[in-house]
């Protein structure tokens, strides 16, 4: 954690997510997504030892991210900046922190899924070097049905 937060001159800070963060995480998750993760999913990720981070500003949780790492690959499972602070660089900061963690675990590539309708996230991922490598049909729940997922990847080596 110290390597991620030590060089930060701003009033925001990154730290590992804890179970006692889940009330605040869920509050942001519910505001950010029409089909949010459940508290149980976050709890299970933490208990499984997945790297998970929160971003705080002046003591208030404004973002979080969850990563899984196995067999030389990392998978970004959830990355979210609170709606009121989106487009301020917080998502990029969280993404870069996850990429640093993945590199530290010697992951060779990082994968993620994103809704095709999420233009801001797609632009962020492209800006950090991710490329679209596929599509998962009907992956996400959506109002009135299902939405595909774009599968994106970044080679770290």
What are these regions (language model features)?
Residues 2-9, 13-88, 92-105, 138, ...:
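Acetyl-CoA-dependent GNAT
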Residues 85-86, 90, 118, 124-128, ...:
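ABC family nucleotide-binding domain
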Residues 111-113, 126, 131-151:
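Conserved catalytic-core motifs of GNAT/GCN5-like acyltransferases
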